[in-house]
C-alpha cells in the first residue's frame, strides 16, 4: 500500500534535553510539501557533531531529532520536485546547495545561505517542522534529521547517488569522509611533497589523513592522546604518530622541531580552542596554512596575537570540506564505486538503530571510529 501523501508513523531517536540519552519514540512524519522529499532511511553514521549537540557544545533547538550523516531511499516527493523520484538512492545534505544564492554562485565557497547551521531554527526552509511526537512538534537538525526511519528534507538538501552504491558505507560521504578529505584537497589545497599535521584521529581526522596522502604529502604527522588510533592512522597514510602526553613541552614546539620550523599544513579536527591554537602555532610562520575542521564550542572566543598571521600564515576553515554538496556528493560516491578510495577502515561498528545510545557510548570511550546504525 502506498504511503505517498499520508502521515507515516515510525521510530525515531528524540533528544528531549541536553546531556541525556536518546529516547526511541514513535513519531509522525508529515508528507512532503512542495519542493520537499520524504526519505526512508537505511543507514546513518554517528558523528561527533551530533554529540556536540547532546553535550551542549553546539546549540540547536530542542526537543529534536538529530543525525546528519546518512543514506536512504526516496519514499515520496512533493509538488515541483525534479531532481529525485521515489525509489532513488539518496544522501541527505546537512549543507544544502540552492544554486541561487550568492554563495552557491561563488565557485570558491559552499556554505549555502539556506543552511541551518549559522542561526539554527530547527525547521525546514519554510520555517515549520514535519515531525510530531506525543502531540508536540519536534525540531529538525541541520534540515535533515536522519535519526528517524523516515525524514523530510528540502529538495536542495538531497543528492541522488548511484543505484548500486552500498548505503551502509556511502552514508559517510554525507559528512565525515567528505569533511575530512575535502579539508585537505579543497580547503588547504595540500601540495605534493609537503608536510602536514593532523590533530584528532576520529573518522573526520582519519579522512583528513587520507586526503593529505591523496594530495601527495611527503610527511603526515598524526596527533592524538589515544595511541590506540595510531595503527589505523598509519594504515591510512600517516607517516608518524605522536601523543602530546609523551612530551614535557607544548606539542606545537615538538612539531616545529620535527619539521624545520613548522609544517606546511595543519588541521584541527577535534573542536577545542587549545588545539586550534596549537594547530595554528605548529604551521610555519612564513608559509603555513592551518585549517579549522572541528566544530568549536558555542560562544567561546580565542584571543591571539595578529603577528602570528602578519608573517605569512593562513588560518581558515570550511564546512563539508569545501564541497558544493548537491553536485559533489554524487561524484564522491562515483569515485568510491570506482575504487578511488575505500571507506572500510573508517567503519568499526555496525549496530541496529535501536542501539543508538550504545553507539554514542562507543564514541565517548574512544573505541569506535565510525559506528553505523542500520534501520
UniProtKB/Swiss-Prot annotation:
Family matches, as Gene3D superfamilies: Medium-chain alcohol dehydrogenases, catalytic domain (3.90.180.10), NAD(P)-binding Rossmann-like Domain (3.40.50.720)
Entry binding sites for Zn(2+) 1: 47, 68, 175
Domain of life: Eukaryota
Biological processes, Gene Ontology terms: alcohol metabolic process; retinoic acid metabolic process; retinol metabolic process
InterPro entries: ADH-like_C, ADH-like_N, ADH_Zn_CS, GroES-like_sf, NAD(P)-bd_dom_sf, PKS_ER
Known partners and oligomeric status: Dimer of identical or heterodimer of closely related subunits alpha, beta, or gamma that are encoded by genes ADH1A, ADH1B, and ADH1C, respectively.
UniProt function note: Alcohol dehydrogenase. Oxidizes primary as well as secondary alcohols. Ethanol is a very poor substrate.
Protein name (record): Alcohol dehydrogenase 1A
Amino acid at each position: 500500500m502506498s504511503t505517498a501523501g499520508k502521515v507515516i508513523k515510525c521510530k525515531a531517536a528524540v533528544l528531549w534535553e541536553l546531556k541525556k540519552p536518546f529516547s526511541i519514540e514513535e513519531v509522525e512524519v508529515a508528507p512532503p510539501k512542495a519542493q520537499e522529499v520524504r526519505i526512508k532511511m537505511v543507514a546513518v553514521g554517528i558523528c561527533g557533531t551530533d554529540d556536540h549537540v547532546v553535550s551542549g557544545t553546539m546549540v540547536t533547538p530542542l526537543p529534536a531529532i538529530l543525525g546528519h550523516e546518512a543514506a536512504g531511499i526516496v519514499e515520496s516527493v512533493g509538488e515541483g520536485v525534479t531532481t529525485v523520484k521515489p525509489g532513488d538512492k539518496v544522501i541527505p545534505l546537512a549543507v544544502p546547495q540552492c544554486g541561487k544564492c550568492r554563495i552557491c554562485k561563488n565557485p570558491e565557497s559552499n556554505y549555502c545561505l539556506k543552511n541551518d547551521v549559522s542561526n539554527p531554527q530547527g525547521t525546514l526552509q519554510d520555517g515549520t517542522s514535519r515531525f510530531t511526537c506525543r502531540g508536540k512538534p519536534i525540531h529538525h537538525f541541520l534540515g535533515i534529521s536522519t535519526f528517524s526511519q523516515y525524514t523530510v528534507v528540502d529538495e536542495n538538501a538531497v543528492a541522488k547517488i548511484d543505484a548500486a552504491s552500498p548505503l551502509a558505507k556511502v552514508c559517510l560521504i554525507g559528512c565525515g569522509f567528505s569533511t575530512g578529505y575535502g579539508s585537505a584537497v579543497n580547503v588547504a589545497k595540500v601540495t605534493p611533497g609537503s608536510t602536514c599535521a593532523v590533530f584528532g584521529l576520529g573518522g573526520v581526522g582519519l579522512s583528513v589523513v587520507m586526503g593529505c596522502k591523496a594530495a601527495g604529502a611527503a610527511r603526515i604527522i598524526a596527533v592524538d592522546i589515544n595511541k590506540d588510533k595510531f595503527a589505523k592512522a598509519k594504515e591510512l597514510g600517516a607517516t608518524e604518530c605522536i601523543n602530546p602526553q609523551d612530551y614535557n613541552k607544548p606539542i606545537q614546539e615538538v612539531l616545529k622541531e620535527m619539521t624545520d620550523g613548522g609544517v606546511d599544513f595543519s588541521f584541527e579536527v577535534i573542536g577545542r580552542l587549545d588545539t586550534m591554537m596549537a594547530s595554528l602555532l605548529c604551521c610555519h610562520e612564513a608559509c603555513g596554512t592551518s585549517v579549522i575542521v572541528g566544530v568549536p564550542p558555542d560562544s567561546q572566543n580565542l584571543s591571539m596575537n595578529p603577528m602570528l598571521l602578519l608573517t605569512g600564515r593562513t588560518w581558515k576553515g570550511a564546512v563539508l570540506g569545501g564541497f558544493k554538496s548537491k553536485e559533489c556528493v554524487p561524484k564522491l560516491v562515483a569515485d568510491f564505486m570506482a575504487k578511488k578510495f575505500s571507506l572500510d577502515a573508517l567503519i568499526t561498528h555496525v549496530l541496529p538503530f535501536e542501539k543508538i545510545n550504545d553507539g554514542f557510548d562507543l564514541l565517548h570511550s574512544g573505541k569506535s571510529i565510525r559506528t553505523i546504525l542500520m534501520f
